Amino acid sequence: MRGGQKGLPFYLFTLILLLGGCQQNDGKCYIEGTVNGEKYEGKRIFVVPLNGPTTAEYVDSMEIKDGKFHFVKDFTKDTIQMYKILLDYHYRMGLQPLFIVGEPGTIKVTIDSISHATGTPQNDSLEQWKVQTEIHNRQLGMMRSNIVNLNKQGDSIHAKYIQQRADSFHLAYKNYTRQLAKNMEGLVLGDFLKNLYPLTYKRQLPDGRIVTMNADTNEEIPE
């Protein structure tokens, strides 16, 4: 009898783990979020498909309570896809809309001036890319501002040098995005990233011919 009592806590612990694991593997996406700022209390927040219909039957919404919100997407019914989380348009100023991949598991979301989402494989990768994107945008913006100021001062030599650095910096970021898209090939995030910086594009010439152009150099690729 005593042996059975000793085994009971271990049994309960195992049962708790199994039940906890069920939530992560039941084909549902649990979005658990917080919004920083008391002024958003009671305001509505929305989960909107990034692509496709955005009519009422495809959009989820709820009121923020105690700075928190919670959504459940059932992927036995819904298609795994990209979503955008954002507040009612009257209250979006100062808050960054957030892209997420709606996939099974629990996604931890923070809506703020810089928003974040982590907790599932694709969303963890998306968050890492988002951090790199913010660094890229900030530094590239500073370089471009510097170029404008140098040109105003008549210093075209230094402006040209910084432009070359900016071009190289931007190309490195595009290649980083392309490589991540390749690593995520076949997944929703891979498709999203792949469409951001294609390697080529088509252009119609004055004579009517359609040619393939290098997206990085804007030069024609010989057939």
Q: What are these regions, as identified by a protein language model?
A:
Residues 1-34:
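Bacterial Sec-dependent N-terminal signal peptides
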Residues 186-200:
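Amphipathic alpha-helical repeat scaffolds of TPR domains
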Residues 151-152, 182-189:
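Surface-exposed helix-capping loop/turn segments at secondary-structure junctions
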Residues 207-223:
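N-proximal helix/coil linker or "cap" segments that precede and/or mark the start of modular domains
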